[in-house]
Amino acid sequence: MFHFFNSRPMLEFLEGLTTIQGLISDPYYIGGGFHETGRGGKLGIHADFRINEQLHLHRRINVIVYLNDNWKPEYGGELELWDRDMKAKRLSVAPLFNRCVIFNTDADSYHGHPDPLQTPDGVMRRSIALYYYTASKEIYKDVPSISTIYHARPGDDAATQREARQLRFDQHLRQWVPPALLRYVHAIQRRLRR
């Protein structure tokens, strides 16, 4: 099940639903995974962490799937979703089996199940929590964007060495020459090779 939630079809579904492109699942389930709460347990209203410090990713989406067979209303445990100003509860979601809740993670996406569970002993509120992230374009400030860098091995024939030099030269051109001018340079190179 966890594999499915981290799969490409799931990521594409979430991207289509949320219009957030480039979603990345968390293979480590930091803060996520299988959650279980017993009688008297609760989770106060809160806004989640937004940076995965291990992977340096921006958290964007929460997905919660409930695993509670025969859940009764008197048990409580409803997920509450609050407005940005914490003035009004916008939605209350019972944790029924196979119910899936998907919502954005931002600085004021307040949620939780703040009332103590009233379950019989041995009855647990169970869920799977999954978080989805995006990478930041700020990485380009720290790491230059280059494509694969080719080198010939010592002893490679002249054609292989020439090809590797040309590929490296093209890489340097892409870093420093505007795209319109680069097309012109490549056109000249093609003519010279004839």
Where are these regions (language model features)?
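Short N-terminal signal/transit or membrane-insertion segments
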Residues: 1-4, 61-64, 72
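Signature of the catalytic double-stranded beta-helix
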Residues: 1-30
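Short acidic (Asp/Glu) patches
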Residues: 17-19, 44-51
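Acidic, glycine-rich loop-and-strand cores that form catalytic or ligand-binding grooves
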Residues: 22-26, 32, 36, 59, ...
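A structural signal for short, well-ordered beta-strand segments
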Residues: 32-34, 63-65, 128-132
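Active-site-proximal inter-transmembrane loops
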Residues: 38-44
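Catalytic core of Fe(II)/2-oxoglutarate
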Residues: 40, 50-59, 69-194
